[in-house]
């Protein structure tokens, strides 16, 4: 469930599972499950490591897919006999590149500001992008200054303090069912 939730919520996740040795995969038994087939519908990508010299590339691609475009879950299946094999020296699977911060074009910001100021009853629906962008403080200041109510998704729960007068809590929480009416 956690992997499927991460994928549907757009949260980057790399799940690594253990597996029987490759020499036992052809034998029908209670210890072997085709995990790559199981994870296929709930991940962006799933791969089994069958040779130690491919570990670096498989791990690198798992993280790349998990973090790219719409983030989500990926899966790596590791048979026990392959996990025990030495990985070639110098294999460094992850080279994290820090992307330069991107900002919206001034015209886009001005257009958005115009729409907000012209709106009769604006409301902000805050999602996981606020969390990933580390923008909770800025969102709270923006909403408070402009007196705009904020509803957050489950993945952004708490990005605006619940005691803030403009917090309309989390959409989908039964105790506070007024979010759907506001939207």
Identify the meaning behind each predicted range.
Residues 1-183:
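N-terminal alpha/beta PP-like core and its mobile active-site loop of ThDP/TPP-dependent enzymes
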